[in-house]
Amino acid sequence: MPLPDFRLIRLLPLAALVLTACSVTTPKGPGKSPDSPQWRQHQQDVRNLNQYQTRGAFAYISDQQKVYARFFWQQTGQDRYRLLLTNPLGSTELELNAQPGNVQLVDNKGQRYTSDDAEEMIGKLTGMPIPLNSLRQWILGLPGDATDYKLDDQYRLSEITYSQNGKNWKVVYGGYDTKTQPAMPANMELTDGGQRIKLKMDNWVVK
């Protein structure tokens, strides 16, 4: 069905919490070499994960809109994942379910939409050009298709620079959750010009 002019609720009561929780410190000093065996091993350990889920705080900030929400991200198999955005009261604002060749999105009115491109659909429905295809790798601490990136002193991603479709994304990682094995990102910030996406992961469950 046609995609309407759909917007998420501006969840202002959550603003201070998210902006504080998602503050990211730019890495300082030289990091480890991307050619190091430790980095290759870390990437392999992450790619070996069959299933994982994380939840936390989400913020999208641009000149046009500000969106704050809680998020839940779950991957159950290759190219099978679920993204849920909720407001402070726990009500669902957006639910996206993706599998190979089919993506379904349900908005906060219960309206269902289908597509074969999750990134394009979520952009049209929300007005937020989230680089979802790349973010699926970045949220795991993997560079995806990016070749311009830096590592921290623990052989993990600290920064990514990636250009695609007229967008120039810079991704900065503010820390990692070492309670999981392998260690997973704890918070990150994506910027492209005047727009920012902030994610703070409260916890990870990996298998």
Curated annotation (Swiss-Prot):
GO terms for cellular component: cell outer membrane. It is a lipid-anchor. It is found in: Cell outer membrane. A lipid is attached at C22 (N-palmitoyl cysteine). Monomer. CDD domains: LolB. GO terms for biological process: lipoprotein localization to outer membrane; protein transport. It holds the Pfam family LolB. The keyword Iron does not apply. It comes from the Bacteria. This is Outer-membrane lipoprotein LolB. It comes from Escherichia coli O127:H6 (strain E2348/69 / EPEC). Gene3D superfamilies: Lipoprotein localisation LolA/LolB/LppX. Plays a critical role in the incorporation of lipoproteins in the outer membrane after they are released by the LolA protein. Keywords: Cell outer membrane, Chaperone, Lipoprotein, Membrane, Palmitate, Protein transport, Signal, Transport. Residues 1-21 form the signal peptide. InterPro entries: LolA/LolB/LppX, OM_lipoprot_LolB. PROSITE patterns: PROKAR_LIPOPROTEIN. NCBIfam families: lolB. Belongs to the LolB family. A lipid is attached at C22 (S-diacylglycerol cysteine).
